[in-house]
Amino acid sequence: MSNKVYTKKGDDGTTSLLSGRRVSKTIQEIKSVGSLDELNSFVGLLRSEILDVNGIFETIQWNLFNAGSMIINDNNTELTEVTQDDINSLEEAMDLMNKELPELKNFILPKGSRSVSTSHICRTIARRTEIEVLECKVLDNFIKLHPISMYLNRLSDYFFVLARYIAYKEEVKETIWKN
């Protein structure tokens, strides 16, 4: 791989799928990959703010890259995929954190320290990206992309629990939404 980042091939509004086939940057798959990249960048920011004790953030980042490659895999190249095991790992991590957290009885406002707020940003980007991936199903990709949308759904939940957990450990009081 060269250090040269620019190729000028995308100047016409197209990009390459895994096969090399050129497609418009405006198709849903490419929008989804862009959102996965955005989420991955914010996970990287979160990693810079709190200790990645068991390596879960790095695993999440790899899974987000894997999800992006699954989306643009138009020639069935064998790839590392997001699996049910990845979803189970998120659920196990949430269960461990939830054991220490007080019961949630109301909606809470997304606020707190920088790491709490960054976790909430990751949560909302994951939720939006899940919806964008689901929109790809109209392009006959639903079976292939279903594990990705499930993973993103769980990932959004994970970042919500993580935000609460960080706030709890930092002794930041949650602000209950008053309706």
Language model features with spans:
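Phosphate/pyrophosphate-binding loop motifs in nucleotide- or prenyl diphosphate-using proteins
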Residues: M1-N179
